[in-house]
């Protein structure tokens, strides 16, 4: 693509930005990136359809993102999700049917890579890597983006999934449901981090426990595993209950601290009920 073409694509995204400025951001967007009716490569669309049929809680959107990367970037600018969950089937050399969840580390792109990505995107080529590259290029990639990827067993024209693809679909749905359920907790932890750094609050049993808990929640966001989270929650709760809190706390601190405990209780109960 020429520099002029790249400029036009950027101008189109900028125009969408102008239209979206007054729109309220959404907390979570589940995006299915798929190649329509291409056997297992259609998995992302099927995940989105299943979630839509089940019904989604307030603030959670699920959409098919099977169109060009520039259009997807424009849609991200409109919705401005705080958390994006991209679901796809993509060949990575893993055993067929394998499903992997990972927290995206945004790529660093040079001008040539951006230009090549936009050139592919305007042709309608669809691939999760391309969606990420274009979103990064136009600076609309959400702060937290999670990838749920299945390894396809069968690719090429065809309706429906292979047996391995069907198993992968169920695994992907389970992982996405977990991500949706954990999103409010992780957003709350993200809000709390800057409030407990530095010396605004005096050290206390509860504050030290909270800092450890937030580190563990960051690990949960990165790796998808609870680790010591609930043991640290109990230590934190005990510190608050025994009034081992910090000098300098205000009403917002108290509200957020107790909200974190309650949110952890909610998520623990929900995941125990749906193992």
Where are these regions (language model features)?
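N-terminal catalytic or cofactor-binding beta/alpha core of small enzyme domains
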Residues: 2-152, 159-171, 177-187
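A broad detector of the eukaryotic-type serine/threonine protein kinase catalytic domain
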Residues: 153-155, 241
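Soluble extracellular-acting proteins and domains
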Residues: 185-274
């Amino acid at each position: 693509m020429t520099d002029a073409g790249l400029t036009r694509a950027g101008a189109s995204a900028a125009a969408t930005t102008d239209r979206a400025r007054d729109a309220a951001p959404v907390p979570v967007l589940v995006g299915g990136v798929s190649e329509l009716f291409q056997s297992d490569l259609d998995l992302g669309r099927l995940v989105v359809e299943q979630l839509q049929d089940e019904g989604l809680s307030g603030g959670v959107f699920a959409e098919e993102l099977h169109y060009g990367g520039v259009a997807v970037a424009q849609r991200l600018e409109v919705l401005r999700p705080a958390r994006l969950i991209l679901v796809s089937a993509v060949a990575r050399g893993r055993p067929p049917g394998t499903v992997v969840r990972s927290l995206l580390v945004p790529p660093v792109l040079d001008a040539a890579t951006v230009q090549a990505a936009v050139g592919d995107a305007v042709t309608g080529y669809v691939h999760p890597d391309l969606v990420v590259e274009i979103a990064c290029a136009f600076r609309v990639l959400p702060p937290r983006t999670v990838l749920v990827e299945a390894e396809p067993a069968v690719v090429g024209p065809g309706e429906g999934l292979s047996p391995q693809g069907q198993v992968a679909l169920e695994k992907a749905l389970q992982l996405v449901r977990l991500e949706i359920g954990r999103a409010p907790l992780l957003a709350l932890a993200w809000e709390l981090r800057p409030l407990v750094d530095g010396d605004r609050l005096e050290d206390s049993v509860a504050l030290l426990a909270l800092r450890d808990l937030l580190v563990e929640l960051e690990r949960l966001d990165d790796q998808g595993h609870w680790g010591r989270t609930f043991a640290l929650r109990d230590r934190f709760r005990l510190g608050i209950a025994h009034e081992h809190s910090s000098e300098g706390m205000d009403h917002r601190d108290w509200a957020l601290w107790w909200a974190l405990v309650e949110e952890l209780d909610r998520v623990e109960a929900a995941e125990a009920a749906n193992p």
